[in-house]
């Protein structure tokens, strides 16, 4: 078929006298060529289309694999529609009402739109909070970062097989999941040289990758780390993590005293069970459905969500933890039983987290931590090595108790200051309101006086005497002022 | 119901990232090799009973630590209350062997005034073809620091029991001799619930020793 036009072409070249036929032939030839070319183009186009279909099928397949987890809380149809509307606004970068988002998020998030919703929440967060210049990440594109080499390569490679090792998307050695994870972690380690790579980050990156593309995940990782400040806890000195452990311990002390005492008696400090909660945002131990829900709230509120979830988890299981009688059984419970709770329990936890507000306490405890550290340092300078240990121990215990008492007092004082401050604020706003009221009244008064002047000029002199009489009357009875003033 | 034990020892397992600390512990406490595992973020805890002599059981509390350097600010807090330690390196990773010295220094600073009885463990000995550290040089280094040396494999279950029980025995001897004593405010060694039978046999052993002197 394909050769035929050529044969005709070749044979037709020598025959001179039969020009008409030749022309006819060449026309045929041309049309045949046209047809052939046309078909070739069509073929190519179909092939391309086919490839596209295949790619989208692959993507769908991988999306299915990525999102294959049981959701905590089912999303109603109406909620889906509201999210659709919100996501449209997202493109226009319109600032949404916080209260509104909060309600919507509480209702649920469909997992198929979760990635987009996180990006929407990040945008909203950025519209409300601007980062000071100092804390901004360097402005280098993801593609540019991928071209470079990282000193953290070994540490990252080693963790690839240990991040969600049983999840089908990440389990294949150097499969698509692990490759994306490597790229993302490498790029971040190059962007944030101070943090580089810290164990725990791979889980956060992994959760993001299950819901969006690599580049979007990079943008969202940047958001969590810089805008919301999660990067602090991964810094080489891990100071911030220590503070967080202290804050959690204090929260337990203040709100769940029995549980706190029980854990203290058995020498279980938060660093033993809560470090992975903070560093992997619950992703290394808890089910993906729960983790995704926690991430929903993190994208809305930031780092304090981890405390809320931790507190809610511990308090919801308080009776069971109290029943564990020794160190081993408590650790076992916190490590294995707690992350394994059922979906309805998880839903309850999430609902509780939406209703909590502990930002003031967290702030106060952070201040406390620093005060305590300073005091500890001073006292360690003061004491001498030769003193008997027992005495020091006793003094230490006493000081500890004293510290606790003082801390409680400090907290009360903080609360008092807070109420006083809010009172003051109220008074100040009232004062300014009053001041502006006075100003408007004065202006009004001047206007009236002017009107009176004008009226006086317009009136004949004999009427003026009458008027003055009236005015005197008015001064005695100010309620009539407005009425008379309006009369020309 | 709490099992009956004579003493409780607290052990700590340290060493570079990915030398196989968690796998070794899990082989010892759970009796299986974990094909997939998460990295240890912070510290983790395991426990097991060991019978060192018929009727004499010791409870081991084993603390697993994160290997990545920046986690030391957290794991450090757990050195002080440990009586024994397994210092791991990977025989197929020379770097992890070179860091042994640094690990010892690190613990020394933070364990004072107490001391940790260490055993040096060359791990992953099933991967002999990829070996980068010879047995001879590891033994030499261990001797220089007054430690025992043992090679183990969690995958093939080689010497895992031995590594833990030998260390436990050594500590037990030190406790018996009075070189390590139970102290208030220190969790390294605790004495447990001792039934009368065991107690009396202990007394017998003690009096016999006294006679020998």
Curated annotation (Swiss-Prot), chain B:
- Renumbered residue ranges of the record's region Switch-I: 35-43
Q: How does it sit in the membrane?
A: Lipid-anchor
Cysteine methyl ester PTM positions: 213
Q: Which Pfam families match?
A: Ras
Give the matching SMART domains: RAB, RAN, RAS, RHO
Keywords of the record: Autophagy, Cell membrane, Cytoplasmic vesicle, Golgi apparatus, GTP-binding, Hydrolase, Lipoprotein, Lysosome, Magnesium, Membrane, Metal-binding, Methylation, Nucleotide-binding, Phosphoprotein, Prenylation, Protein transport, Transport
Write down the EC number: 3.6.5.2
State where Mg(2+) binds: 22, 40, 64
- What are the BP-aspect GO terms? autophagy; protein transport; Rab protein signal transduction; regulation of autophagy; synapse organization; vesicle-mediated transport
Subunit relationships: Interacts (GDP-bound) with C9orf72; C9orf72 in complex with SMCR8 acts as a GEF for RAB39B. Interacts (in GTP-bound form) with PICK1 (via PDZ domain); a PICK1 homodimer may allow simultaneous association of RAB39B and GRIA2 to PICK1 which is involved in GRIA2 trafficking. Interacts with isoform c of RASSF1; the interaction is strong. Interacts with isoform a of RASSF1; the interaction is weak. Interacts with the DLG4/PSD-95. Interacts (GTP-bound) with HOPS complex components VPS39 and VPS41.
Similarity comment: Belongs to the small GTPase superfamily. Rab family.
Q: What is the protein name stated in its UniProt record?
A: Ras-related protein Rab-39B
């Amino acid at each position: 078929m394909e050769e035929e036009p050529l044969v005709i072409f070749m044979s037709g070249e020598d025959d001179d006298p039969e020009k008409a036929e030749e022309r006819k032939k060449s026309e045929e030839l041309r049309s045949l060529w046209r047809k052939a070319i046309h078909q070739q183009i069509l073929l190519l186009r179909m092939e391309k289309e086919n490839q596209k279909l295949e790619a989208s099928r692959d993507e769908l397949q991988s999306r299915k694999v990525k999102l294959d987890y049981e959701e905590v809380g089912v999303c109603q149809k109406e909620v889906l529609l509201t999210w659709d509307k919100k996501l449209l606004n997202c493109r226009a970068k319109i600032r949404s009402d916080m209260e509104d988002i909060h309600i919507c998020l509480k209702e649920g998030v469909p997992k198929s739109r979760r990635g987009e919703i996180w990006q929407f929440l990040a945008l909203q967060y950025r519209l409300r909070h601007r980062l000071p210049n100092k804390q901004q990440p360097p402005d280098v594109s993801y593609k540019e970062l991928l071209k470079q080499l990282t000193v953290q390569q070994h540490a990252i490679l080693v963790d690839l097989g240990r991040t969600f090792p049983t999840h089908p998307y990440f389990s294949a050695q150097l499969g698509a999941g692990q490759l994306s994870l490597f790229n993302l972690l490498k790029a971040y380690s190059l962007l944030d040289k101070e943090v580089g790579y810290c164990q725990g980050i791979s889980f956060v990156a992994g959760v993001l990758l299950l819901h969006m593309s690599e580049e979007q995940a990079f943008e969202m990782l940047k958001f969590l780390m810089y805008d919301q400040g999660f990067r602090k806890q991964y810094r080489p000195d891990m100071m911030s993590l220590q503070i967080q452990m202290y804050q959690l311990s204090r929260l337990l002390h203040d709100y769940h005293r029995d549980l706190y005492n029980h854990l203290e008696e058995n020498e279980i400090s938060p660093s033993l069970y809560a470090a992975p909660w903070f560093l992997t945002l619950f992703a290394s131990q808890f089910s993906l459905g729960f983790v995704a829900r926690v991430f929903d709230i993190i994208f809305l509120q930031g780092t304090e969500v981890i405390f809320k979830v931790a507190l809610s988890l511990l308090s919801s299981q308080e009776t069971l933890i109290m029943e564990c009688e020794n160190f081993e059984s408590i650790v076992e419970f916190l490590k294995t039983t707690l992350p394994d709770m059922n979906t309805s329990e998880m839903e309850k936890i999430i609902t509780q987290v939406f209703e909590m507000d502990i930002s003031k306490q967290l702030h106060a405890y952070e201040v406390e931590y620093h005060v305590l550290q300073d005091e500890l340092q001073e006292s360690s300078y003061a004491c001498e090595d030769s003193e008997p240990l027992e005495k020091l121990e006793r003094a230490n215990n006493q000081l500890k108790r004293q510290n606790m008492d003082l801390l409680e007092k400090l907290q009360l004082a903080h609360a008092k200051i807070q109420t006083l401050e809010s009172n003051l604020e109220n008074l100040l706003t009232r004062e300014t309101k009053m001041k502006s009221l006075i100003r408007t009244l004065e202006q009004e008064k001047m206007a009236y006086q002017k009107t009176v002047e004008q009226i006086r000029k317009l009136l004949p002199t004999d009427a003026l005497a009458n008027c003055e009489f009236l005015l005197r009357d008015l001064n005695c009875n100010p309620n009539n002022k407005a009425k008379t003033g309006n009369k020309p | 119901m709490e099992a009956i034990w004579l003493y409780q020892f607290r052990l700590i397992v340290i060493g570079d990232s990915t030398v196989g600390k968690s796998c070794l512990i899990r082989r010892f406490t759970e009796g299986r090799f974990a094909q997939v595992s998460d990295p240890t973020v912070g510290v983790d805890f395991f426990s097991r009973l060991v019978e060192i002599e018929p009727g004499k059981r010791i409870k081991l509390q084993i603390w697993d630590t994160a290997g990545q350097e920046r986690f030391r600010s957290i794991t450090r807090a757990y050195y002080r209350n440990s009586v024994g330690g397994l210092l791991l390196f990977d025989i197929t990773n020379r770097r992890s062997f070179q860091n042994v010295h640094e690990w010892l220094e690190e613990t020394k600073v933070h364990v004072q005034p107490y001391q940790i009885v260490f055993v040096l463990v060359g791990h992953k000995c099933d991967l002999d073809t990829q070996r980068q550290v010879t047995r001879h040089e590891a033994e030499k280094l261990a001797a220089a620091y007054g430690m025992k040396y043992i090679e183990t494999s969690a995958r093939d279950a080689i010497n895992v029991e031995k590594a833990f029980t030998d260390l436990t025995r050594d500590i037990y001897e030190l406790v018996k001799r009075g070189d390590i004593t139970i102290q208030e405010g220190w969790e390294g060694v605790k004495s447990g619930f001792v039934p009368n039978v065991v107690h009396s046999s202990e007394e017998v052993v003690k009096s016999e020793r006294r006679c020998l002197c």
